[in-house]
Amino acid sequence: MKKYSLFLLCLMAAISLHAQSFADYFADKTLRVDYIFTGNAAKQEICLDGLSCLPSWAGRKHHLSELPLQGNGQIIMRDAANGSVIYKTSFSSLFQEWLETDEAKAVTKGFENTFLLPYPLRPAEIEITLLDPRRNVRASMKHTVSPDDILIHQKGTAHITPHKYLLQSGNTAKCIDVAILAEGYTPEEMPVFYEDAAIACESLFAHEPFRSMKKHFNIVAVASPSEDSGVSVPRLGEWKRTAFSSHFSTFYSDRYLTTSRVKSIHDALAGIPYEHIIILANTEEYGGGGIYNSYTLTTAHHSMFRPVVVHEFGHSFGGLADEYFYDNDVMTDTYPLDVEPWEQNISTRIDFISKWEDMLAQGTPVPTPSSESGTYPVGVYEGAGYSAKGIYRPADNCRMRTNEYPTFCPVCQRAICRVIEFYTE
């Protein structure tokens, strides 16, 4: 009887914790936290760079202490008084990608990173952790935020960047809010930017499951102006003065288009409800990049703009991995072959039951030969995550593998659907 009573007590406590509402812990505002991730391949550190308050909260108000995906890093917010977990989020970062390059073995660098958290009603402890490819802790730090701290910068009440909604399905509290920003567009070119943003929006919702779940999204185009037209192309010696200082040749890969000026992105969005970010670069050069829960950045005037913006959003929103691979790829060793990746669309088969094993038709050969892709639309095809051997993808082709294939594969569709449901249901 005593054991039963103890079990009942624990169960009730767990249910009570799960049922606590957003309003018990948070105001309807956003705590923006800026960090600097710094270090090299041997040692990494996390530094707090600043705190800001934004006038509203556009993120989820349920599943507060759960994660949709593990990511390459995590933030846990706890009530400082009793230590209970009141919010979690996960992410990846350009810094962690850089740590796997040869340059990181020789020099120390710092990278900006910004995260949006619900604004606590009472003092809260924030713990941020960076993980390595083997899921070991690389760096971690804790700090306490007091909501009445006078040095928390108030932003988003004035000087708001001009913007217009391309899709407004409902209240920001219930919908997923995606902001599309201009990069390399002068004030005179903003009509072109709005046209490009509309194409990006149209392209996204031409794909399942975004098409059938369109009602869950708000899309806002934000006219962030640049001094120069175009973006920087280092291999051509071209350096432009743009809103977010983006450039190609990230990590000396010609087509990898990114920015390390993350704070400027969020400054441009202050006062506009947003959760996820797409940045359009005013250039005909081919390239792009997508970082989970950070941003998508893609060229807007290359012929492959439409498929690339969707592919990169698959990274930044859906947490999907690249399914392509090349012989002698410099990123071949990105994923250890004895560790199951957290991304839902690739597998080392170490923990395949957690991936798409349940979606395989009876009798599907494992591995699945590419020659039988017509028979097995969902299989276990070798070659993914930049490696030709030891990593598997769920379909012979997919939007996450090539620009030419018109759709996400069934496994990627399910993964994206689950993320949308996590944020909205």
Task: For each feature predicted by the language model, list its residue ranges.
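Sec-dependent N-terminal signal peptides
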Residues: Y4-A13
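Fold-level signature of zinc-dependent metallopeptidase catalytic domains
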Residues: I150-R211, A221-V231
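Sec/Tat signal peptide C-region and signal peptidase I cleavage site
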Residues: I15-A19
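Short pre-active-site segment immediately N-terminal to the catalytic Zn-binding motif
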Residues: M190-F193, G288-E312
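Catalytic Zn2+-binding segment of zinc metalloproteases
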Residues: F313-D329
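Beta-strand-enriched, solvent-exposed domains that form extended recognition/catalytic surfaces
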Residues: Y25-L151
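Active-site-proximal segments of metallohydrolase catalytic domains
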Residues: H216-Y292
